[in-house]
Amino acid sequence: MEHEPSVSDLRVINTSDFMNPMVTQIWSNGRHQVRCAKVIRETHDVSTFTFSMNQPVLFFFKPGQFVTLELEINGERVMRSYTISSSPSIPYSFSITVKRVPDGLVSNWLHNNLRPGDLIAVHGPVGDFNCMDHPADKVLFLSGGVGNTPVMSMARWWFDTDSPV
């Protein structure tokens, strides 16, 4: 039976929930097959793609990290990395926010082809630019363009966990 994301999947959890012995599967790295659960057209050239696994699996990442998508486009294997824009407090899914690049092979393919229900391979998460490994009492971010997505993830995490930053 396939798992369809539901409202219960979107509940906010704490980091201690990741250590719950009742949880049987935690994905923290490696290559996995994920299903596109939702596509949100943010603007005419920016979309957010949300992914989940067929079975409930806690997807743990540090806010600011990225995943690498492995796609087959025009018969060729293509890999591109995108920062996760969602918060790890949403336990069974993650999102990437992608701006369409005029001549971008992958960004255009995602915008034109990826639909809810489609399967793709994902590697990761990885990356050292995150707020868990580099805690601070106060932060100031200046970002623009693709630099917004790691900041989105961090800000959402701090909000969801009532962080005092």
What are the residue ranges of the model-derived segments?
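Ferredoxin-reductase
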Residues: 15-119, 123, 137
